[in-house]
Each structure stands twice: as C-alpha cells, then as structure tokens.
Amino acid sequence: MASNSHNNYNTPRRQNYDVPKAWEEDSLYENIDFLTQPAVSSDTSEDEEPLPLGRETGRGSRGSTRPKTPRGLVRPRQDADNPSSDEGFDWEPLESFTSQPGAFSFLEPPRLSSSNTASGLRSSCSDFTILGSSGENPTSHANLSEEEMYEEIPPLASNPSDERHPRQLSGAVAQGAIRKSPRKLKFKPAKFKGLSSSLLNPFTASDSGRRARRQTPTCQPGFTPIFQDLGEPHYVKACTVFFEGCMAAGKTTLLNFARQTLSDDEALTIPEPMRFWTEVYTNVLSQIVKINKECKPGKTSTTAELVSCQLKFATPLKTQSLFLQRSVKKDSEMQPVGPLDKWVIVDRHQLSALVVFPLVLMRRGMLSFSDFFNLLGMFEAHPGEVIALMSVNVEENFTRLKKRGRVCERHIDRDYIKEIKGSFNAAYCAWLFLQYFSIQTTMQICMGLSSLDEACATEGVCHTTASRIWNNSMLVTLSDIISQFSNDYTVQNVCYNFFSQLSTLKFVVIDLSAFRHDVPGAWGEFYMQVMKNGDIKTRVMDFTAIKALADTAHNTHASLD
C-alpha cells in the first residue's frame, strides 16, 4: 500500500501501473497492487520552467548621433475614389530594413497634426502617400512601384573617423543582441517575426526590400449552420448507436457501409471529428505521438499534457451527444426498437476519451491518479444511447493498423493494443457489474463499507459470477485509488455520478474476427444483436436537425481528404 501522503496521487508513477500476465479475460486486473509507492526520482529538470527573460533596461552607452537628413516616410492612406474594404482598421507602423547595406531605419508612427488632418490623411491599405511632404499631391504616389515606394537613405559620411564608429540603430546593438529602444520597440517585438535572418545579425536580412503582406485566411469548407432555424421539426423514432473499440477494429468501415447501403431516410451517420482534432488550434494526434516518444512516465508535465489532449478528444464527442439529446422531443417516451425505426450511428463516444484511454495512460504510468479521477468525473451519458463495442484479435488488429499506415499510429505496438482492448473490457465489466448490483451496493463495496460476499448474499447473485466480473472490471482500480479518500464527499459524488451515468448506457459486444472481408455479415450481426436486446430503446428525435449535423460533419471530413 502507498503512504498516506496526498502528493502520491498528484504525481504520475515512474513505471507501469501494473503489468498483467496477459490481456485475456481470465487475467485482467487480478492480484494487482495499484498503490505501490514508486521510487522518488531526483530528476526534476524537465518539470522546471525556464526563467523569463528580463526586460532590457537600455542603459548601454549610445554612440554619437549625426545630424538627421530630412526624409519622407511612406504611409498608407485611403483613396476616396477607391475605398478599401479595410476602412475600419488602423494599421500599426511597420519596421523595415532598408535595401542599402549598412543602413537601417524604422517607419515612424503617424502624427496627427493640423496639416495632416486638413488634407484628410488616414491609415489604410489601398494606396500609399508620403507623410512630411506637404507640398506634394498625396494621390500622385498611388501607383508607385515597389522600388520607388521607400526613399533612399543617404550613405554615411565619408569622414574616416565615422568609419570607426558604425551607425547606431534605433535598437542599440550590444553584446551580440539588439536592445530595444523604449520608444519605438517596447511594444512591438512580434514585428520581427517576418524577417528571414536572425535578430542577432540584422544586417544580413534577406527580405529587406519586401513589402509586408497581409495574410489572408484559408478558405473554409462550406457548411450548414446547425444553430439556425431549420424549419418545422420532423420527429421520428430512432435508435442512437455509438461505435466503439480499438483503432482499426472496423468501426469506420461499418459506418461507411451503413451510409452507402441505407438512405438518409433510414440512417444518418456521423464520422469522427478528425478536423477538430487535427486543424482547430492544435493537432492533438501529433501531440500524442510526441508525448509517447519524448515524455517519460512519472513527470508532472507529462500528465498535464495528456489531460489537455484527452479534453480535446472529448470536447466534440460531448457536444455531439448533447446535440442529439437536444433533438429529442420533450415528454416523449422511449420504446423498444423495431425493424421500421431509423438509425443514428456515431463514430466514437465520450466513453473512450474520458474513461478508457485515460485508464490505459494511468496504467502505463503516464497519467496521475488525480487527473484520471478528474477526467472520470466529467463523463456523462444519456438515456437511449447504445455502445456497440467492436473487437478483433490482437494480431488481426495490429495488421490492419499497420496496413492503413497513419503517421499518428506508428508508435502503437501489440502490447498497446492489448492494453486498449483490456481497458474497453474493464469498462464493459464495470457496466455489467452495475446490471447485477444497485449503485448503492456498488458504492459500499468500492468504499470498503461492505464486502462482495455480503453483497451477493443480499442481492441473490452467484458469488462466482460476481467475483469474475468484479476482478475483470475497472471497479477494482477505482476502489484502490479512492481507498484513502473515501470519506470525502466530493469523491463520493464523483463515484456515484460515474456509476449513474455508466448504468444509463446499453452495450452490445460484436466480435468481428469471424467477419473478415465480410462487411455485410458484420452489419447483420450488429443488427440482430440490437433487435434481440429488449433493453435497447428508441427515442423520438428531430431527424431534420440531426441530418444537418451529419451533413456538416461529412462535408468537414471530406475536406481533409
């Protein structure tokens, strides 16, 4: 057993949580001491954040300044004849390296004066006018070439004494670095990002004469807003099924078969939200690959990154489930599924993102007990949701995984597939245990207030069956994790809520190993299991709203191909 220190649950283990003999049904989670105290590592360098760089004070000695040569600065203006679409923007002045070797200048910010105001000067991106030359017509510079757009700065004086003292920049160069001028560069360090050379040597900039260009946003795929009024709702009885299982188990293949075989009036399918995972803000799949390659078990930074990844995996899955729940007609009753009912098939449920994969990561020592418990508390399910758990043997699964050759799955080996299959089986056994025992009885067993023998005697359940299910379920792991904190009411609420949400689901288990290259046969097996299960119910749902969601999801998914 672990010590009584609470810090043991905030730090991930530095070794595998447990190493089962094999990921077979007879050996899952048996004789495992989950709270073995790991050896404390003195290596903390990876968790220490680098100290922020201090602000430059600018106390370095400045060279003698030579008399300034009057010059006009190029500034954009708004042409009255050709109004720009960016009229409302006031663009910040750009810093620019001149094309002349050894010369460096900054574009001064505009100064609002009476002469400028009277002539109607303002900032825009339609054309350019020269500020500081009041005698010239502003519109005469609208069509200047790129070479004529910036003035030439005269070279340094030919005095030999000046050659020994190089020209000082607005940002003083000292000790191999640029020290920002308090007035011009204090709030604009990000402007240097467009330069192709290093800031340590600004005189070697290769894009000195290039005009700064505005980045245009990439074209987004067309979509149907799911939040707009879609007209009169069209309510039908539909069975909501979520395909779950290990990667390359056949979920997407079966979903595409249903989409191609059945019409939109019979079945609607929602694919994986791959675009959100890979293109919105960050690529979470690449992050997972990087963590598995570089991060070490037992590091706080590792578990923090994994929590961030799992939350991003769970976000679209939770919102899809909530959208389907909002589509249910109020005060409608669920009824047993029939041959003429509609289908709503979704690839992945939040069960995998918040329960199964966090369980795998915790067992591998990558995720701390505390973070696993927090993710568990975010899980939720709704009445009428069905989990179709699909599986194939490990060797076939590994062969399929390598055949499709995704970059984000190169780090997955046979042992990892076994662990994922075992975690899905552990979650299923936990649900199965709740079908034999009430939530209150399960809580008492997990909190150590009652034994399994007493629960079997009270509920009238065979002890052999209950013991086998209990030992293969994730409830053994959960009871060991919360054993030292079972008297905390928040821990009790999280466990009670998790058991309540998990018991709401309905499961069907489909072994696809017997249906290799037989997708219609696999669909027939799934269909028959759903029809024979009297506990699976349909919900009265707005099929028009769900179709808008499904079409948007498929259009977004197709834009990635």
Swiss-Prot record:
Domain of life of the organism encoding this protein: Viruses
GO molecular function annotations of the record: ATP binding; thymidine kinase activity
Binding annotation for ATP: 245-252, 400
E.C. number(s) listed in UniProt: 2.7.1.21
Top EC category: transferase
Chain positions covered by the region annotation Disordered: 1-22, 34-122
Keyword Kinase annotated: yes
Catalytic reactions of this protein: thymidine + ATP = dTMP + ADP + H(+)
Chain intervals with Polar residues compositional bias: 1-14, 112-122
Single biological process term from Gene Ontology: DNA biosynthetic process
Pfam families registered for this protein in UniProt: Herpes_TK, Herpes_TK_C
UniProt entry keywords in alphabetical sequence: ATP-binding, DNA synthesis, Early protein, Kinase, Nucleotide-binding, Transferase
UniProt keyword Kinase present: yes
Family under the similarity heading: Belongs to the herpesviridae thymidine kinase family.
Job of this protein: Catalyzes the transfer of the gamma-phospho group of ATP to thymidine to generate dTMP in the salvage pathway of pyrimidine synthesis. The dTMP serves as a substrate for DNA polymerase during viral DNA replication. Allows the virus to be reactivated and to grow in non-proliferative cells lacking a high concentration of phosphorylated nucleic acid precursors.
Protein name listed in UniProt: Thymidine kinase
